[in-house]
Amino acid sequence: PVLAIALVPLVLNWPWATRSYDWSARDWGYNLLMSVEPYGVLFTNGDNDTFPLWYAQEVEGVRRDVTVIVTSYLNTPWYARQLRDLTTPCPSGKSPDQDPTRVICQRPYDASAEAVYTMTPDQLREGQIALPLDRPVRPPYRPIIDLDDDAIERVMSSYIMMDEAQSVVVGEIEALLPAGGYLYPWHQLGLTIINQSITDRPIYFASSGNAASELGVQPYLVRQGLAFKLNNGDLNA
């Protein structure tokens, strides 16, 4: 009888607690990925805003060309190495799908998703909005982290105290870092990724996190669907 009491919450809560036919997380992940231009880099905050994206990519095959970066994981060397390797352009004769257990190089943009970047009357009626592209779709020519294993390990052991505010130039952007805190490894790698990728790939931040603010690049963001795109330069120029 005592153990049966434990079943009471299950029975009473099941009708509203079940996730059957609840597609909100899946749809949110799909829409966020489809807010990003081909071969984009997308910074997320943590598990809750990342796992729906990974599900969409790995289970449904949606926008596998997008590199999802979990900022809370960037403080670990294995994750930095993984990002470097999976964004490295594939050498001639090598396919990113040849190893079923891991991603070994940059996965290609799937042209079957091109309907997102054009607009027809049917799409407009269905609420689909085209994303304007400012350049032709082309594969990236370099990884997002161009550091060897030793350099990555050195970054992981570096915690910089910000005694005073500093500005860091990344591309045509001036990132403003406030005083009074620490510059953690993920901050350093995040700025490195932006600096190395801003002319090679579109860079985005999920609307669910504050990574752009912590990296000091928030004034350069433009809303695009469920993501914020980082503009390489002054928005008012």
Task: Tell where the protein language model's regions lie, with residue ranges.
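ER/secretory pathway lumenal C-terminal domains and tails of membrane proteins involved
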Residues: 1-41, 51-237
